[in-house]
Amino acid sequence: MVNFTFHDYGFDSGSSGIPQSKLGQDQGNSNIIDKTRQERQENQIEEQSVVFDVAIIGAGFSGLSAAVLLGRYLRPTVIFDGGNTRNSTSRHLHGYLGFENSSPQEFIQKAWSDVLQYDSIKVVKEKVIKIERDANNSNYFFLLTTESGKVVTTAKYLIIATGIEDSKPNIENFDMFDGNGAWHCPHCDGFQTTNRKLAILTYGKNTISYAKEFLGWTIDITVFIQGNYQLTDKDRNDAKTLGIRIVENDDIIKISGAKNGHIEKIICQDGKSYDADVIFYYLGYTVQNQLAKQLGCELDEEGFVKVSSSQQTTVRNVYAVGDLDTDRHYIVFAAASGAVAAISIYEQLLKDAIKNAIEKI
């Protein structure tokens, strides 16, 4: 008979990975209080000899989606939570079934409560700054070092969920409306422009293509080109045909309105003002691919990490999920990619465990 112990953790976390009081119960509606998360975070990794099956870098929609499945698979997993998620300034979340109009913060809090039901999950509230191969191990493991340098962790598999960082305008009062009157994603918040005066802030590249995405909601669109970018003749002709107004060579310096997200005016450098109800900005972003680069993962021309259908990168045992691997920036896609990576890793771990057990007979 095969002696099969795939569920063993390698650290003291109980025999099942689920609190005994919850075995056999529906855990979907459990509400774990913040104290539980705090205790787990304070119980950071004390023994560097512990080898986790999976290290997840990033605790947004994709990272936590992967974590909850790995918890249910009883896999010893560590999550590195480096701080705010991309949409942490948004007031409401849209397009995610069951969470319409809830806040991203509420969603993340609920996601954490789901994840932290599983004792095989550990949390480190630090940013990972370095990943390298474990030179003392022949099993292709990874060493992860955090910003403080105090936490060095070993893992068999990596899920990188570091996402992207949006470029935001340096405009007076912008912060007051960011996520509440001013947004960047048409698919997430374009509905908010319905039959309203829309101002689009952009540096120019792909401007008209971006503006066209809103025509299903509003035809009252003014595009403000920031900086010195010159539109192509085709863009100008398309804009004129579609009734999209263009303001050039006159950067926005101020947004006026009420603190409740009610925008009233766009004020430009030359003193002119324009009526507006809603702002969308398209100023580019930075792909947070530094760790993927360290590992030698192949990137595309825009800096996104290339992945297979299972979210695996071009480097063995390294997966990339969420906004890091695609320009389809939508929370449903992010969560789905995390689940795909978790399932793929679990299947490979199980396959390897069965193979090793049989070879020992």
Predicted regions and their residues:
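FAD-binding core/adjacent interface of flavoenzyme oxidoreductases
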Residues: 2-55, 122-196, 269, 278, ...
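Short glycine-/acidic-enriched loop or helix-start segments at secondary-structure transitions
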Residues: 66, 89, 133, 169-171, ...
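A Rossmann-like FAD-binding core segment of flavoenzymes
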Residues: 109, 115-147, 152-155, 218-304, ...
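A conserved FAD-binding loop/helix module that cradles the flavin
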Residues: 210, 324-361
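Active-site glycine-rich loop that binds ribose-phosphate moieties when present
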Residues: 180-187, 200-210, 232
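Beta1-alpha1 glycine-rich phosphate/pyrophosphate-binding loop at the start
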Residues: 52-109, 202-229
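Short, well-ordered coil/turn residues at beta-beta hairpins
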Residues: 161-163, 168-170, 201, 282-283, ...
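FAD-site-proximal beta/loop scaffold in flavoenzymes
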Residues: 176-192, 283-330, 340, 347
